[in-house]
Amino acid sequence: MSIDFKKYIASVKDFPNEGIIFRDITPILQDGEAFAAATHEIAEYAKSRQADVIVGPEARGFLVGTPVAIELGIGFVPARKPHKLPREVEAAAYDLEYGSNVLEMHKDAIKPGQRVVICDDLMATAGTMHATKELIERLGGKVVGAAFYIELTDLKGREKFPDVDIFSLVQYTGA
């Protein structure tokens, strides 16, 4: 059975700032069938990319990536915001649609040569993906794909990564 995931995404105007339409994935997470279907579709994608490990950026990447890793029986590595990891880290800065931040990963989180699929809720300007990919590559991993619940195509994030296969459940163009 195919699910229309757009039915499970709430569009919230002027959040977190005026002029932004926030695409809220929590209705997918709240519906067991939709959540399982989204997880399965992304897991099938990651399997097709022969992923050894899933990396998810904080915070919603944890919600997307962890169940995918469980379904595939592979590891999950969190890319965290600053000062959340207790051991030695590698860090990368990035810009968002409405701010900037830093992501960190433990220096031993990715083994050299591991095939990595990045999982997150949304691809917009691709700042988060850029920082996540940079960290993975610095640690010796190979990004073989990226999967998102939502892609905002007008922001052209995909175009910044011609060398990465990108999958999204839902695409939005315009407002």
Swiss-Prot record:
Subcellular location: Cytoplasm
Alphabetized UniProt keyword annotations: Cytoplasm, Glycosyltransferase, Purine salvage, Transferase
GO MF annotations, alphabetized: adenine binding; adenine phosphoribosyltransferase activity; AMP binding
CDD domains for the chain: PRTases_typeI
PROSITE patterns to which the protein is assigned, alphabetical: PUR_PYR_PR_TRANSFER
Pathway stated in the Swiss-Prot or TrEMBL entry: Purine metabolism; AMP biosynthesis via salvage pathway; AMP from adenine: step 1/1
Reaction it catalyzes: AMP + diphosphate = 5-phospho-alpha-D-ribose 1-diphosphate + adenine
HAMAP family assigned: Aden_phosphoribosyltr
Family: Belongs to the purine/pyrimidine phosphoribosyltransferase family.
Name assigned to this protein: Adenine phosphoribosyltransferase
